[in-house]
Structures are given as structure tokens and as C-alpha cells.
A protein has these predicted regions:
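Conserved phosphate-donor
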Residues: 1-3
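A short, compositionally biased
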Residues: 5-11
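ATP-dependent carboxylate-amine ligase
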Residues: 8, 17-195
Length: 195
């Protein structure tokens, strides 16, 4: 069954229904529309299906308010596509926008290239600041690509990211935290400044 929808603010608009989006981001709105189309094809009313509860574990598409900051907590895992989608979500936020990007692990021979693509997107979005958490080749490659940003820091650990952020952040800022699970970027959250 064909299902056509449009996104307005935090709602998915269908012919017969206005459905609240359970997750942030255009990529998640597309996913919801696809799921509703499959359900509709199987005979499930889209408005009824949209009433289901969405339970997302910590570190996945979680919006937190902490100390005057809005945190987009994506610390659980990262792939190139997921990081690009998260950066686009950050770019859609009002106010000053900062990204803390850790290594994407297990990418094989294309790891450097894929990290450079992510850094290029961060630079193109003209974010207000980026902290890269990686002491290896990937971090240095990302820093070289994003070197035109006014605020850019390369640190070795999540805890070390608190220092540059402490100098940059002000009340009302939005901070994206995104990395592979092995980076344990969630360790940074309690260290972020209250502004």
C-alpha cells in the first residue's frame, strides 16, 4: 500500500492522521513512515500502529537536559551512516551546536577514508565546535579534514574532552555525543560543565 507523509516539526502528517515522531531526526521519520507503510500493507491502520510505545535503551537517540545544555546522547554505537545522520540532526537544532565525535571501530581498510568523510560533513555544517576523541590515525585524519573550524580539539580520551568543552560551552548550546561503543563516550556526560 502506498503511504505518503510529510514531516512538520515533531509530527508525521499522513492523509488521515497526525502522528507524533517518537525519535528525533529526518532519518528516523523516514524509518517510521516505512514501518507504517509495511504495517498498512499488512492491514494495520497507520494511526493505530503509531500509538505503540518506543523504548530506546540509553545512548541511542536520547535527548538530555543537563546544566543548561541540551545533549544528543548517541554514545552507544556509531557507523558512518549513523554519524552522518546524527550530524544532520545536530545541524537542524537551534542555537550553537557542538559535536563530540569518537572513533568508529571495526571499519577495516576504509577506516581512515570513512572518518575523513564524517569530518568533512562536520566541517561543511559549520558547527560551532568539534571535539574528536581518538589518539590514533583516524583522529588525526579527521582533524586534518576539519582544520578550518574555529573550534577544533583532538583528545585521546572521553574525559579529556571536558577541558575544551568547558571553555566553549554556554547555556542553551546543543552537544552531540557520538562514538562506537568501545570508546565509552558516555563517561564524558557527568564531566560536562554546568553553564
Amino acid at each position: 500500500a502506498d503511504l505518503i507523509g510529510a514531516v512538520r516539526n515533531d509530527r508525521l502528517l499522513l492523509d488521515e492522521a497526525s502522528i507524533p515522531l517518537p525519535l528525533d531526526g529526518r532519518h528516523n521519520a523516514r524509518n517510521l513512515l516505512l514501518a507504517l507503510a509495511v504495517g498498512s500493507h499488512l492491514g494495520v491502520d497507520p494511526a493505530s500502529a503509531a500509538q505503540l510505545q518506543v523504548n530506546i535503551p540509553g545512548g541511542r537517540n536520547r535527548r538530555l537536559q543537563q546544566g543548561g545544555l541540551t545533549l544528543l546522547d548517541e554514545t552507544y554505537n556509531a557507523s558512518p551512516e549513523a554519524v552522518l545522520a546524527a550530524l544532520d540532526l545536530l545541524a537542524d537544532q537551534p542555537g550553537r551546536r557542538f559535536a563530540v565525535l569518537g572513533t568508529m571501530l571495526e571499519l577495516g581498510d576504509r577506516s581512515i577514508e570513512l572518518h575523513q568523510q564524517v569530518a568533512a560533513r562536520a566541517a561543511a555544517l559549520k558547527l560551532d565546535g568539534v571535539v574528536l576523541v581518538d589518539g590514533g590515525d583516524e583522529g588525526h585524519a579527521m582533524a586534518n579534514v576539519a582544520s578550518g573550524l574555529d573550534r577544533l580539539a583532538l583528545v585521546a580520551t572521553p574525559e579529556a574532552a571536558a577541558a575544551p568543552l568547558g571553555q566553549w560551552l554556554k547555556a542553551g548550546d546543543v552537544v552531540l555525543l557520538k562514538a562506537s561503543r568501545g570508546v565509552a563516550l558516555e563517561r564524558l556526560i557527568p564531566l560536562l560543565p554546568s553553564v
